[in-house]
Amino acid sequence: MYKRLGPTCAVNPRAMRESEYTLEKAVEPKKVMVIGGGVAGMEAARMAAKFGHPVELYEKSDVLGGELLAAGNRPLKTEVAELNDWYQLELKELRIPIHLNTTVTADMVKAAKPDVAILALGASSVMPRSIPGIDHAKSVSAIDALSGKKPVGDTVVVVGGGEIGCETAMHFVLQGKKVALVEALPDIMSVEFVPNQHKNMLKDMLEHHKIPIYTSHRLMEINDEGALIAPAEEEAFTLKADTVVVSVGMRANPSFASELVGTEIEVYEIGAGRRVGNIYNAVHDAYEIIYNL
């Protein structure tokens, strides 16, 4: 509702476009294989079934949801967890076969012989290899920290002042932890698009909880003491921390789409695997592809 797109909805591509997007069954159903059980993959599988295509969904982990699992734990984003629950109920009601703990390869796709392969391979946290100590025991990505994959101590430094970093800082402050936020740029949430209402609310919350924010500071090292940071052209100093949470962006996961070139399979890449974006991008990508099969 905030990107000058006219009236729209992040999770309902048909909103205000009902006459354009009809729900008629496909005249020629196609066998669809969806690889990736995040929001884009779940939407693709759901709509494929709705349009009458036989579809199966494959997910490499033991649970569906992808980035929704971590996002649903962030302050002001509890509705994301509810969205994940809703998708899984939809998939169950539509009786879509779901294959968990299954890492799909190009050879597996070729052997399955679908008419359509939807690659919703998602994205992973950027962990800059150039930073000494990035693999230190105290270092953890924001996604792993929020989803509970790794424990987080009582004193936390969050590196990265984008929307996810700010929400991560608030998440742990609300748990009673002592948190500091570090951002390389002169202001937080200044690069990616964040709706003004949400940005202002987050800034107010950070200020209300008196979270120290070190703008124009770069992470130099993660060590036994915590995070070594430095302002421009000044001496570095250490912020002591039990855990250093790194939130400096996402990168699309590797794709095997090129290995399917030359087959008769229609191949589409959707969601964060095609371009790192948000729920709106993932859902609308999936819907557009399935609608036009």
Regions found by a protein language model. Give the residues of each.
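Cysteine-cluster motifs in flexible loop/terminal segments that predominantly coordinate metals
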Residues: M1-P29
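Positively charged, proline/Ser/Thr-rich regional signature most characteristic
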Residues: K3-P7, L119-K138
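Rossmann-like dinucleotide/flavin-binding elements
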Residues: A26-K60, L64, H99-K113, L121-I131, ...
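Rossmann-like dinucleotide-binding cores of NAD(P)H-dependent redox enzymes
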Residues: P54-L94, H171-H217, R274
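Short, hinge-like loop/turn segments at secondary-structure boundaries
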Residues: N73-K77, A117, D135-A137, Q197-N200, ...
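Short loop/edge segments at beta-strand edges and connector loops
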Residues: N84, L100-T103, S141-I143, T215-H217, ...
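A short helix-to-beta-strand connector/capping loop
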Residues: L91-I98, D135-K138, L206-P212, T263-E266
